[in-house]
UniProtKB/Swiss-Prot annotation:
This is Sorting nexin-10A. PANTHER family: PX DOMAIN-CONTAINING PROTEIN, SORTING NEXIN-10. One of its GO terms (cellular component) is endosome membrane. Gene3D superfamilies: Phox-like domain. The lineage of its organism: Eukaryota, Metazoa, Chordata, Craniata, Vertebrata. The gene is snx10a. The PX domain mediates interaction with membranes enriched in phosphatidylinositol 3-phosphate. Pfam families: PX (PF00787). InterPro entries: PX_dom (IPR001683), PX_dom_sf (IPR036871), SNX10/11 (IPR043544). Keywords: Cilium biogenesis/degradation, Cytoplasm, Cytoskeleton, Endosome, Lipid-binding, Membrane, Protein transport, Transport. Belongs to the sorting nexin family.
């Protein structure tokens, strides 16, 4: 088998989808996006993964990638919009598409695939501070351990297409304010809080039986920031 044949068979597929609203308090609300990765590339430790990230984390990633690859012109992110509206379907879809295009371009740049922060961003649940610390070797766990500990059931569009095709028109009868109307659900704050509570309970039980408490705590904590981005 020649190198050309091998390169044709290697692939890295990424999807940015399923925007969900997270309400931190009365004033602070943001949207997170699900990032699904499917690959057979030897560059990645896990061949399938799903994590959730917010816009500000994409900004951090681009900044770190640029610092480590000064001679490369990185793809641009969708611009920050001071008038971004959480209830505006067009704003959400436009940003989501821009984030996916950014990741697709990054993953097509071989030099960037060696950056450990990119792998932590795509395949771990660590916060920005924890990703930075882990990449610099300042944690008790390695990059590989952080990635392997990431749970998250992967859900890919190509695998769900059959289910989508089998749905009846009753889907349209179920539309409500919890849906963007574009196939990307906007999760109410109450459901998000339930998910977070579930994660906290899981982390507590895991810590009680696993000595790697620091890593588990990092994986179970979701990043928090300011305002609506």
């Amino acid at each position: 088998m020649d190198n050309t044949s091998f390169e044709k068979r290697e692939f890295i597929s990424v999807w940015v989808r399923d925007p969900q609203v997270h309400k931190e308090d009365f004033w602070h609300t943001y949207i997170s996006y699900e990032i699904c990765l499917h690959t057979n590339s030897m560059c990645f430790r896990k061949k399938t993964s799903c994590v959730r990230r917010r816009y500000s984390e994409f900004v951090w990633l681009r900044h770190k990638l640029q610092d480590n690859a000064l001679l490369i012109e990185l793809p641009k992110l969708p611009p920050w919009n001071p008038f971004f509206n959480l209830n505006n379907e067009f704003h959400i879809t436009q940003r989501m598409q821009g984030l996916q295009q950014f990741l697709e371009a990054v993953l097509q740049t071989p030099l960037l695939l060696s950056d450990s922060r990119l792998h932590l961003f795509l395949q771990s649940q660590l916060s920005i501070a924890k990703m930075d610390a882990c990449a610099q070797g300042h944690t008790h766990y390695t990059v590989a351990q952080a990635i392997q500990r990431c749970g998250g059931e992967a859900r890919f569009p190509v695998e769900e297409q059959h289910q989508e095709d089998s749905k009846t028109c009753c889907d349209s009868d179920c539309d409500s304010t919890t849906s963007s109307g574009l196939g990307c659900s906007i999760e109410p704050a109450t459901l998000v809080e339930q998910d977070l509570s579930h994660n906290e309970r899981f982390a507590h039980e895991f810590q009680a039986t696993n000595p790697e408490a620091e890593l588990c705590s990092s994986l179970s904590s979701s990043p928090h920031g300011h305002s609506v981005i």
